[in-house]
């Protein structure tokens, strides 16, 4: 009896855990599961729902998209023009932020006196919020704002300068609110470049500009492209600055405003189509940026051997 029992083949484990182990799943899956559920509930489902809604226009099918590209929305006669307006705002604002952030981050990585205080000052606009910044810029740059009053008092100008209600005012606000985010990303990437590379180049007689252009800048380029991409996404979704500082009649009528107006008037298909076009436009720009990044240096930024 005991010999027969010993010769029996042990049963294969069964149950959910055994099924998961047999297919390569581990207990780490349970750690990832909340994130997957969150993504499905708050990202994938809204995107799929919005995409489906965008095909339910007045004539069904792609009529909402056709109306967008022919400027035929019932409550917005310049929807397609708003796409170019948004790009003309977001791209220059992002480029200016990157051009300002790169040299500052490069200088800060070497260490400066009061680095924490200076970094905190640069980060202040991010903590204020875009609505507060837009309202502040109205008081600062408006026809009766402090800047114009100072210029008039000093007799530098005879009439107030038009710095709000136009393209320039929105662009300035976008740069002001986007710069801290851009700087923070660039500072993190610049800090990852080994300072010994600069020291070695300096010992070989390279000056500061030579070291920057020939050593640091090529190493920074992958980080610059990522920073540009993320900053562009932030600028492309501009709404408070364009609404409070711009002119909805045309010069600064951005896509987010078009979507808001259509949604407010119950044209949900048009609003969803506008949102989908916004997403595609961003993906195209990001695709170009990442294509450029794929051709850049992707090796180590440390000065170690090997």
Identify what each model region corresponds to.
Residues 23-27, 59-62, 67-74, 236, ...:
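Interhelical loop and adjacent transmembrane-helix boundary motif
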Residues 17-21, 134-175, 209, 242-249:
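Membrane-interfacial helix termini and adjacent extracytoplasmic/periplasmic loops
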Residues 50-95, 264-266:
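Periplasmic/extracellular loop-to-transmembrane helix junction in inner-membrane transport proteins
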Residues 33-37, 41, 124, 176, ...:
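Transmembrane alpha-helices
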């Amino acid at each position: 009896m005991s010999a027969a029992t010993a010769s029996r083949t042990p049963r294969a484990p069964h149950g959910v855990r055994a099924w998961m182990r047999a297919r390569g799943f581990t207990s780490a899956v349970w750690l990832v599961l909340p994130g997957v559920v969150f993504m499905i509930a708050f990202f994938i489902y809204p995107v799929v729902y919005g995409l489906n809604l965008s095909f339910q226009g007045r004539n069904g099918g792609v009529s909402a998209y056709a109306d967008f590209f022919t400027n035929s929305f019932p409550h917005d006669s310049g929807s397609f023009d708003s796409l170019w307006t948004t790009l003309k705002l977001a791209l220059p604002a992002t480029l200016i932020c990157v051009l300002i952030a790169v040299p500052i981050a490069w200088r800060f990585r070497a260490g400066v006196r009061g680095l924490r205080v200076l970094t905190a000052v640069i980060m202040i606009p991010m903590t204020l919020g875009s609505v507060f910044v837009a309202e502040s810029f109205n008081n600062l740059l408006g026809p009766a704002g402090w800047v114009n009053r100072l210029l008039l008092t000093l007799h530098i100008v005879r009439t107030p300068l038009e710095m709000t209600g136009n393209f320039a005012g929105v662009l300035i606000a976008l740069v002001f609110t986007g710069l801290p985010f851009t700087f923070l990303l660039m500072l993190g990437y610049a800090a990852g470049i080994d300072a010994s590379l600069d020291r070695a180049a300096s010992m070989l007689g390279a000056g500061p500009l030579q070291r920057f252009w020939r050593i640091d800048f090529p190493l920074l380029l992958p980080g610059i492209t990522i920073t540009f991409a993320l900053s562009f996404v932030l600028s492309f979704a501009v709404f408070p600055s364009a609404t409070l500082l711009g002119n909805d009649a045309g010069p600064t009528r951005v896509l987010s405003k078009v979507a808001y107006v259509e949604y407010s008037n119950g044209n949900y298909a048009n609003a969803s189509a506008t949102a989908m076009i916004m997403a595609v436009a961003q993906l195209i720009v990001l695709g170009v940026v990442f294509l450029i990044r794929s051709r850049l240096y992707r090796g180590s930024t440390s000065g170690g051997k090997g």
